[in-house]
Every structure is written in structure tokens, then in C-alpha cells.
Design a protein with these regions (language model features):
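Surface-exposed amphipathic alpha-helical segments in non-transmembrane regions
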Residues: 16, 23-32, 63-80, 93-179, ...
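Hydrophobic regular secondary-structure detector
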Residues: 1-108, 112, 116, 267-627, ...
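Alpha-helical scaffold elements that line and support the substrate/ligand-binding pocket
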Residues: 180-182, 190, 400
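PDZ/PDZ-like domain micro-motif
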Residues: 189-191, 265, 570-571, 575, ...
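Solvent-exposed, charged amphipathic helical/linker segments at domain boundaries
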Residues: 182, 706-713
Length: 826
């Protein structure tokens, strides 16, 4: 090592070029780094989605999910298989080990799924793709008192405009419904004309078409033959001929049905500050530049607002660039203050030149670290910059130890290049081994094979690179800069004060510290016992919960999310009642704060976004900046929870006021093949959780039970020329509907559904009047050929590694959640 140090110390030009190269690489790396508030959640997982319209959860589980699981169980590199079966939908998530090539894994899974035999005929083609978790970057709200269709079409146009902006590519819409053309057949009209449901559906399929029929090759050129009769409006569908009699009379769709060119039936109410609204969510991209993306969006907003229709406005609702800039400003100020303090402390006992070059060496080490981070997939975010602060002390120690050693040798041996070489060489072994042990301490984070391991991996990369660059700077560059040190003579001014401070420190070390050191060395067993005892006491204090620990401490957001999941089949009116309950809590909170502090109510909440559908209610409360309010986000969230109270029929209630939290505070997963045993275990665990004072919103993932009407063919029905498959098909057509085609429109395909009127489909009594048609055209009351029985069914089935699974969740404060976990595991 001494030879390497000597060469660089004797070649200062090379040392300076090395320093310049490190700094240049650092600057270029800093410029090219991705910038985001928090690192992306990278996971090697494949998701398989299957849509089976109208199917019950048990059917989806048995005929779709289990067959896909069976095909994937023996696939190499599969770490975990999770699945969910709900009404009309099945999803299988296949997680791979961290060392697996994800692209090859996706292809392997896709090949296995494509080879599965026996899947139901009427399912949509399984969609296989890599799971991607993308954080929200910016959220823009489009709101105004206009019709739903006008607001949706405008939002779709604006989405395309935003997606074309630089540093933006993924934009999702929330608060909209899919467009749908519905042909609502009248049972009375079909009976009067003698037309069946299937006849109408087939007429639309065969008449509403665009079809290429080849071409005529003439002497003057080819002429294409095309049938262009695709219906695309209400009038087009109403004019489709269903039947034409021998006398020339025609029966058209308009004679039998009401055509509605609107939206799918799932009602949804989306508002912002009381106005109809649509949210445009800008998601994180692969090359994240959150600040530049924010600037581009703000410029676009300023240009677009004047062009909007009257009464419609765009509001920047959420911007992670503000969080990023705030955190970076705090960390940057801490770094600058730290370097200044290091310089001031060093200059108390070391020469200004030594203090300056040592401080500069620390800065060079940190700047140089940026040169290697982009190549290691590390972005500039709160986590990576915190790693810089974490390693700051060790980097400072390296530079100070080497610089002080060179300074000491210059004082004792006359200075010059040889003193610089000797000083650096004298401490090379302890410094290098200290750095290596630190690298080893953080090395396990490289190999964490867990979800989210990419986040902790950034700590190890930053620390390892920073320490490596600091060693290069301390032993290859710093000696060349301090080779001109000479022994100080004729001390005066600052030099005299530095000598006095140095003598004071040495006097303390030679007297008080030396005495303590000798005393402890002579009583080594007592000394060891004291430190072992202190260690045991420290562990005990931590284990008892007196000292709280959180690997990822909560970072409060400027928004509070309230998410209420209701059972499938919940009436839309009930969702509106829950939404009203949340809004009343908000108004009561504003009133409370306003009565306690004059004018404070206007400063607490900036806006309120709400979305209600049949099975979920979401509210987002936007708070004013922290410096403009007296209550923290946590206090506001806790008070809102108290004011809202419990919602007994809700399957899940979540109130989140942090940026970096995902999911409930407490989660337990129970696995077994017997659903009855899972229900019993879940109930027992929920009762236990409810006994803790700090736990609330205790739920499981079963989402209660739903009523089902089971149909069974009566004896003798087959003699009438009818079977259960025919009855089921006709009932499905009547109550679920039949998709006859999809219309290509500007913003995506639009389903064309043939079904019975909504009023009929929302009444149980309609089953008593429903008639099924036999193959020879006869109509029979449905209940004359089938028996109906009401049974209980599940709303959702979760599976993990071929077993059924139930998740039990609860909300609690971070500290209370840890205590509850600890007590339950005893």
C-alpha cells in the first residue's frame, strides 16, 4: 500500500487529474440520475387475469384459478403463487426469486397458461403480464358542472395531451365509467312479434358489420369490395331489421327495445369540492424526473386552462415534486451545515490548509459517488440521500485520520512529500479495515430476497460506493495536496490559538483519559461486566418497548386517504350514505377547528375529493401546507376517524395519512384448505384483536356472505324438450345480458350489450313471471320447469400456494401495532 501512496504523492498532476475525473464523473452522474420522492417498488412477479362474465367466485376458483395453479406449481423459479377469485374475475400472481430473469420467466408462465386445457369457453383470453407497481407522481383534477359524457370525453382528450408531455408517459383516469351501448329488450314486445332474445342478438351481429369481401381485378386497376354497415349510434341500432315477413312487413330493433348509447350500469359519483370531477393520475415512468415532469405539467396547465369550456377547471391536486424538493432541501441544508461544522472543528487544531483539503476531500468523495449510482440503478430520492448522511461520519473519519496523521508527521519530521507518504501509510491499515468492516456490515442488504429489497439495496450501494471513493481520495489524492506542509515556527494569531487548543486536548488525553484508561485496563473483568450489563439493559429497554423502532418511519403526507370497501352487491344508495357520513365528519372537523381558532378552518383543508360506487367509497382530504396549520396530518386523520366512527357493514376501512405506508398496520394471513376452519380461526383472531385498546377497524378478507339463487331442473322437464343448460343460458341473457359486438371508438372499444330493462333485472319477483322458450318456440313459466333455492355464497376467495387463505387486518398506530404483534406472538 505504501508504494501506491508514494507514487500518487510524488505525481501531483496525476492526483489532480484523478480528482478532476472523479468530480466530472460525479457531476455527469448527478445530471443523468433519476429523481423521485421515493424509490420504485421493484418486484419480480407475473400476474394472470381472467375475466369470466357472470361467473360465481366458486366457479372461477374451481374451473379457472385451480387449473392455472396446477399448470404453474412445478415451474422452476416459482417462489409463491397467490390467487383471488371473485364474481366474474380471477387473478393469479406468480412471484419469482430475485435471481430469475424476469423476461424469460414471463414467457415461461405465458406458455404454461396457453397450454392449459379445459378452461370454460366463454371466458376472455387470459392476460399474462409482468406486475408493475408505479407510484403516483402528479395528480390533476378536472372538475365542472357539465354532463358526465362531456366531462369524460374532455378528460380522455386531456389525458392524451398530458401523456405527450416530456418526462410523462403513463396517465390513468379515475372517476369515469366505460362507455356502453345497451339494447334493452321488452318482453311484451318480443311476445307480440314472436321474436326471441337470441334472434335479436343474432340480427345485430349479422347486420352491424364492416367486412372486407376481397377485390375485383379490372384492366384499369383493383377495386376493393367492402360491406360497411357498422352501427355506431342509437338510430343505427334501432333501424336494424330483426325479421321480415312474406308480406314485406319488417320488425326492427327499435320496435322491440330501447337503445341507450351511454355508460355501463355501475353507478359512480365523483366530485371535487362538490363539483363532478375526473382525476388524471400521472404515474412514475422508467426514467423518472419528477421535478422536470412537474414543470412541464404546470406549464401545460397554464396554457390549457384558458381553452377549457366555461365552468370547467383544472386543479393541480397532488405533486410529489413538492415533497421531493422539500426533502432534498432539508437534506442538502444538513449536508452543507455538516461540512461547515467539520471545517470549523478541524480549524481549531489543524492548519487552515489541512482543514480545507480534508473538507474538500469529503466533498469530492460524495460528488464522486454520483458517478457510479446511475449504472447501479440508484435514483436520487429520500432513501438514497439518507444513505449519504448515514455514511457521512465514516467518510469524515477517513479524511480526518489521514489528514491529521500527515499533519503530525510534518510537525515531527520536517514535512515534505516523504512526511505525507509516511503519515498516510501509518494509518492505511486501520482505516482500510475500518471501511471494509463497515461495507461488510451493510452487505446483507444486497442479498435481501424480499419484496421491496430494491429499496434497502440502495443503502448498500450508496454506502459501498461512497466509502470506496473516500478511500481513493484519502490515500491517492489527499497526500499529494498536503505534501507541502512544513513545521510551523514563529506562532502567532490563529496559529498560536490552534497550538493552545491542541495542547489542551493533548493535556486532557495525557492526564484524565490516560488515568481512566489505566484504571479500566487493570480492572478488565469489572470493565467488561459493566459494558455487558449496559448492553443487556439496552436490549431489555428495546425489547420492553420503551425505545420505539421503525425501519421506515412514517412520513406524513399533505393528503389523507379514506378508503371504505363495501360488500359486493351493496346498493348504490348505501354507498351514498357512507359518503355523506364521511363528508359530515369533514364539516364537523372544520367547525371544531374554526371554533377553537379564529379563521383556522380556512387554513386546515384546501380541498375534498370523493368517489362513491356500489362497493367502495373513497375520500381524499387535501390539507394546507404544514407551516400554515397547527394540526399535523396524523392529528387530523385521528380526529376524522373519531368523527366518522365505525361502519359496521364495511368489509375494509383504511385511513392513511402517510406517504410511505402500504396497507393496514396489522395483517395476519391464515391458510388452510377447509373454508369452515378458516372462518372459525379468523373469527377467533378478530375477537383477540378487538380486545386490544389500540386496534380498530378489525376485518377479514372474506367480505361476508352473499345470497345466491340456485336453479335445479324439475323431474319431467326434459320431456318438454328443455334442459338446464338452455334455462341457464336464457336466464343469463335476461339478467346479465349478452355482448353482441364491440364498437371501435376513439378512446377504446365500446361494448354493445343486449339485455332486459333494468327495472326487471332489479326485482326478485320478475323470476316468477319469467318465461323460457323451448326449441319449438313454446314459452313456459320458468318455475314450472326448474326449482329455485336461496343459498349463501362467498364474495371472494383468496388462495396462497394452492391453499385457501384469509387475511385478517386491523388499524393501529405504529407503536401500538408493534406491541400487538409482540404480544400475539408470545
Amino acid at each position: 500500500m505504501e508504494g501506491i501512496i508514494a507514487w500518487w504523492a510524488r505525481n501531483p498532476v496525476a492526483a489532480n487529474l484523478l480528482m478532476a475525473g472523479i468530480m466530472l464523473g460525479g457531476v455527469l452522474g448527478f445530471i443523468s440520475m433519476e429523481r423521485e420522492a421515493f424509490p420504485g417498488f421493484n418486484i419480480k412477479q407475473v400476474q394472470i387475469e381472467v375475466i369470466w362474465p357472470g361467473a360465481a367466485p366458486q366457479e372461477v376458483e374451481e374451473q379457472v384459478v385451480m387449473r392455472i395453479e396446477e399448470a404453474l406449481t412445478d415451474l422452476d423459479s416459482v417462489r409463491r403463487i397467490s390467487a383471488t377469485a371473485s364474481e366474474g374475475y380471477g387473478r393469479v400472481d406468480v412471484a419469482a426469486y430475485s435471481y430469475v430473469d424476469i423476461n424469460a420467466f414471463v414467457n415461461d408462465v405465458k406458455n404454461r397458461v396457453d397450454a392449459v386445457n379445459g378452461l370454460p369457453r366463454d371466458i376472455e383470453k387470459p392476460q399474462v403480464k409482468r406486475t408493475e407497481y408505479r407510484d403516483e407522481m402528479i395528480r390533476v383534477a378536472l372538475h365542472g358542472n357539465v354532463s358526465e359524457k362531456a366531462l369524460t370525453r374532455l378528460a380522455q382528450d386531456l389525458r392524451d395531451q398530458i401523456a405527450a408531455l416530456p418526462y410523462v408517459s403513463i396517465v390513468n383516469l379515475y372517476g369515469t365509467r366505460r362507455e356502453e351501448v345497451t339494447v334493452e329488450l321488452s318482453e311484451a314486445s318480443m311476445r307480440s312479434f314472436g321474436v326471441s332474445f337470441a334472434e335479436v342478438a343474432q340480427a345485430i351481429r349479422s347486420s352491424s358489420i364492416n367486412l372486407s369481401s376481397g377485390q375485383v381485378r379490372t384492366a384499369t386497376g383493383d377495386i376493393r369490395l367492402r360491406a360497411r354497415n357498422l352501427a355506431d349510434s342509437q338510430a343505427d341500432f334501432e333501424n336494424i331489421i330483426v325479421r321480415q315477413t312474406a308480406g314485406g312487413a319488417t320488425v326492427r330493433v327499435g320496435d322491440l327495445a330501447t337503445v341507450v348509447d351511454g355508460f355501463e350500469e355501475n353507478k359512480i359519483l365523483t366530485t371535487m369540492n362538490g363539483q363532478p370531477a375526473v382525476l388524471l393520475d400521472l404515474l412514475a415512468t422508467d426514467n423518472m424526473q419528477v421535478v422536470k415532469a412537474s414543470e412541464a405539467v404546470k406549464t401545460w396547465l397554464a396554457q390549457t386552462r384558458p381553452t377549457l369550456p366555461q365552468g370547467v377547471n383544472l386543479t393541480l391536486w397532488f405533486d410529489t415534486a413538492e415533497i421531493y424538493k422539500s426533502r432534498m432541501s432539508t437534506i442538502g441544508d444538513s449536508a452543507y451545515m455538516g461540512l461547515l461544522l467539520v471545517f470549523l472543528v478541524l480549524i481549531l487544531s489543524l492548519r487552515p490548509k489541512v482543514a480545507l483539503w480534508v473538507t474538500a476531500g469529503i466533498a469530492v468523495a460524495f460528488i464522486g459517488t454520483f458517478s457510479l449510482l446511475p449504472a447501479n440503478d440508484v435514483s436520487l430520492n429520500v432513501m438514497s440521500t439518507f444513505a449519504f448522511l448515514l455514511v457521512l461520519g465514516i467518510v469524515v473519519d477517513d479524511a480526518i485520520v489521514v489528514g491529521e496523521s500527515i499533519h503530525l508527521h510534518a510537525q515531527r519530521h520536517g514535512g515534505g512529500t516523504e512526511a505525507a507518504i509516511a503519515g498516510a501509510s501509518a494509518v492505511s491499515k486501520p482505516v482500510i479495515f475500518a471501511v471494509i468492516t463497515t461495507m461488510i456490515a451493510f452487505a446483507p442488504w444486497f442479498f435481501l430476497d424480499v419484496e421491496g429489497g430494491h429499496m434497502t439495496e440502495q443503502f448498500s450501494i450508496v454506502i459501498t460506493v461512497a466509502l470506496t471513493i473516500s478511500l481513493i481520495e484519502a490515500f491517492l489524492i489527499l497526500p499529494a495536496h498536503l505534501r507541502h506542509l512544513k513545521p510551523r515556527e514563529n506562532l502567532r494569531g490563529l496559529s498560536l490559538w490552534q497550538r493552545r487548543i491542541e495542547h489542551s486536548i493533548m493535556h486532557f488525553a495525557d492526564t484524565y483519559y490516560r488515568r481512566i484508561l489505566h484504571w479500566t485496563a487493570r480492572r478488565r473483568y469489572l470493565t467488561s461486566s459493566i459494558f455487558i450489563g449496559a448492553f443487556i439493559v439496552s436490549v431489555g429497554i428495546f425489547s420492553a418497548g420503551w425505545v420505539k423502532f421503525s425501519f421506515f418511519p412514517e412520513i406524513q403526507n399533505q393528503q389523507i386517504y379514506i378508503n371504505v370497501m363495501l360488500p359486493n352487491g351493496t346498493p348504490y344508495s348505501r354507498s351514498l350514505e357512507v359518503l355523506d357520513q364521511l363528508q359530515r365528519a369533514e364539516l364537523q372537523l372544520i367547525e371544531e377547528v374554526g371554533s377553537g381558532s379564529t379563521g383556522e378552518s380556512e387554513k386546515l383543508i384546501q380541498g375534498w375529493y370523493a368517489r362513491a360506487s356500489r362497493d367502495s367509497v373513497i375520500a381524499i382530504v387535501r390539507l394546507t401546507p404544514q407551516e400554515q396549520r397547527t394540526m399535523s396530518a396524523r392529528e387530523v386523520a385521528q380526529r376524522l376517524q373519531d368523527l366518522v366512527g365505525d361502519i359496521p357493514d364495511a368489509d375494509e376501512i383504511e385511513v392513511n395519512y402517510t406517504i410511505n405506508r402500504r396497507g393496514p398496520a396489522i395483517t395476519y394471513m391464515l391458510r388452510h384448505r377447509d373454508m369452515g376452519m378458516l372462518r372459525a380461526a379468523s373469527g377467533e383472531l378478530q375477537s383477540k384483536l378487538r380486545s386490544y385498546e389500540g386496534a380498530y377497524y378489525v376485518r377479514d378478507s372474506l367480505r361476508g356472505e352473499s345470497d345466491e339463487i340456485h336453479l335445479k331442473l324439475l323431474p319431467g322437464a326434459t320431456r318438454l324438450g328443455i334442459n338446464l343448460a338452455q334455462v341457464s343460458q336464457q336466464v343469463r341473457q335476461a339478467y346479465y345480458g349478452e355482448e353482441v359486438q364491440r364498437l371501435p371508438r376513439e378512446n377504446g372499444d365500446v361494448k354493445v350489450m343486449v339485455k332486459y330493462p333494468r327495472a326487471l333485472r332489479e326485482s326478485n319477483s320478475s323470476l316468477n313471471d319469467y318465461r323460457v322458450r323451448t326449441a319449438d318456440g313454446r314459452e313456459l313459466p320458468m318455475l314450472s320447469v326448474v326449482a329455485s333455492e336461496v343459498n349463501n355464497g362467498v364474495q371472494r376467495i383468496q388462495r396462497r400456494d394452492v391453499d385457501r387463505m384469509v387475511s385478517v387486518t386491523a388499524e393501529a398506530d405504529v407503536d401500538q401495532a408493534r406491541d400487538i404483534y409482540t404480544e400475539l406472538e408470545r
